[in-house]
Amino acid sequence: LPIEVVRRCREAVGEDFIIIYRLSMIDLVPNGSTQEEVVQLAKEIEKAGATILNTGIGWHEARVPTIATSVPRRAFTWITKRVMGEVSIPVITSNRINTPEVAESVLADGCASMVSMARPFLADAEFMAKAEAGKSELIAPCIGCNQACLDHTFSGKLTSCLVNPRACRETLISWQPTTSPRAIAVVGAGVADCTR
């Protein structure tokens, strides 16, 4: 079915349209796909007309953490590196890549053609501008806590970020510089308060 879906999409949109297919590279659940099956599907998806393969790591039901703080940075890039040797289209990797330096090392090591990030952009909406300006030390990093992003999403609450209180509230709160600045002290501040 996935191969047919990609084939039909390619027929519908023509050759000059990018089709990104998200493929679970490792399921991390009992009776999940084997690496051989993943590679075989990746090859068939490429033949069917996908332009890029995007990496999925594990299922939400998996008992293996994939994005938590305890997971080492770039921990699953070995999986995309293995698939890259089997297909000729670009392969995107993800999971626990939360600084420009980590992303660059993934690319330099040939573990992926591209890097996907999501939570780092919740943590700091200016991530790319700071990275491009060579000021990565000013980026408020995603700490992998998943408390205000995933936990809120799964409980039907507004997604946010513990290190960025503005995340997902950009249109609800108007942040304007004060006309009468004052010196204040924050007592009992957590890590999120100290990053700004």
Predicted regions and their residues:
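Flavin-dependent oxidoreductase catalytic cores
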Residues: L1-R196
